[in-house]
Structures are given as C-alpha cells and as structure tokens.
C-alpha cells in the first residue's frame, strides 16, 4: 500500500496553496495499482493519479526496475500528442518519507574507492609459468571460498531464477546486447542467432532448476577482483598496492584509494603461508541468480587467456581452470554445476570474443572462442577434460 501520510506531506510541500488532500484507491491491475489524489486549493479542486507497480514479475522485481519504468514515463509522456503528462517520480525512503527523484537529465553513482591489483595481472603472468605457484593457488582458494560462502545464501523464487535465465540471454548487457555491439563482419547475424537460439533452448532445460537460486555477485570477472599484496603470515610488512587503469570487461572504471569502511569490509581468505585479501567492484544485474553466473564470469578467462597465449588451454591456465571448478564443487557439493553452465559460458564467451573489448585478438583466436561456445552449448554438460575438444 502507498504511504498516505508521507504522500500528503510531500504534496503540501510541493503545492503551497493546498487546503485539504484526499487519497483513495482507484483499483488494481496485473501490473500495479492507481490512487486518486484530490487536492482542495484556493483556486479550486486539482486531481492527480499516483501509479504503483507490483514488486515481482514482468521485470519489475527490484526497486530500481520500477524506478526505471517511471523515470522513462516521466520523460516520454509529454512527447506524445494527447497523452497525459507525468508530474514527478516519487521515492519512498527507509524512514517512510517521500521525496522526488524525477527530472534528472542524467544519473550517476557515488561509491567508495578501492585499491589493489586486479586479477587480470595474474592471468597475464600465467603465460610465463608451466604451473601455478603457492600464491596463485591461494588466490583461487580465496575466490572459491568466497563464492561458496555467498552462494550458500538461498532464496525461494521461481520468478527471480527465471529472470536471471532470461536476462543472461536477452538483457542489453548480456548475450544479445553484447552481440549488438559487435562490428559488422565479426560474426554473421545467422551465427549470432544460432548461439542465441541454443541458449534459449538451455533456458527451457534450466527452468525446473529454480531451487538453485542464490545470492551472487553478478559480474565476477578478473577486472572486478582486486587483490591486495599477498602478505606472509610471518611478516606484517606489505608492499604498497599498485594502481591500474580501467579494464575491458568491466562496465565501469577502476576506482582508486580506499576508505576505512572498505578496508574493514574486505574479504580475507587463505590459510598457510600467506594471507590473501581482496575487494570487489561492480556488482551487477541484481543480487540473485545461479552460481554458474559467477563461476563462468571468472573461469572463461582461463580459457580466453590461454587461447591468446597458446592457441589452446594448457599449462597454468588449464591447472587454474580445473582447480577453480574442483575446489568450488568440493566446497559446495554442487556437482550439478557442470550441467547448467552452458548458457552462461555463451554469454561470457561473447564478451571475451568482442572486438570492441579485445581488438588485438586474431580472427583465428575469435573462431576458437566461438567454437568453444557452440560445442559447450551442444553438449549435455560441461566436461573439464574435453575443454580442448570444445575448441575443435
């Protein structure tokens, strides 16, 4: 229900000549409800309608979804002849008060700053190694332990699980949206459509698995994982963090520096000879989904970087890929993971094969990534031992 007292307080603040305000519900539909606002003023009666949206289904699941609908309404109602005009977009705050958020020309996010070395640096160094060293393994243990922990938070919602499946294929930031940013000639429209169709078929297979819904990061790729300098447990000396510029897979910029609150909130993982600390950036596209989203966001990069450097998946890259999956499954018992990753790998494969993000990739390297995507989609489950067969 709408907060009538807070709404009346907002109206009396915005319309100075109000004598009396009456609010009554007009009715409800499949998307939401409408409320009639009648204001008695010195110049007569003025009438308005407040519209609400239901909080689950039709892509209106999160408050930000509903805000986006209303902000677009406010901008565009006035641009169509004979259409009623929007007056404002109202937000109900934590304390119950109502304030205006309408009328902005653009919107920005103010956030904390973070420091460190993003995991892309480690992946680049893998090309110089035949096998992982102790710090490499500790970082993988730290990441898989972290994911196992956040993924243990479950939610019972068929709607939100199905939305994550739908968004993975159709969202503007996911498979179809990424393909739409490809320069013409990179991949034919038919080839793009074929990958999309296969991914849609996977949605039908995964819909019954809605019990998998869990808390996720949503964009757990190397550019969003910033490690602090690995510190020996025998020493309190730590080298200064190195600062790096923006990275290609991120939806935003790397933000530098760190507040005391961010330092306190850092995840500390790892046992044995080193403490491994990291901080995360750019959680994306909602708090709930399938753990496969986070797992593939990271592991596609072992495959991608190995293709860039070796033309196949081998050496420290294959070791990292195998260790990441095996450690995570050992921690969670989620053997089903291998049977659900395919459409998520399709999305992440489209990202790393994108010439806009990685213009230095050769045509042959892109072809290997697309073969991987198609062959994983064609298999009934992802098999680590077949990773190079998927490139063929």
What are these model-predicted stretches?
Residues 285-332, 346-363:
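Active-site activation/catalytic loop segments of kinase-like enzymes and analogous catalytic loops
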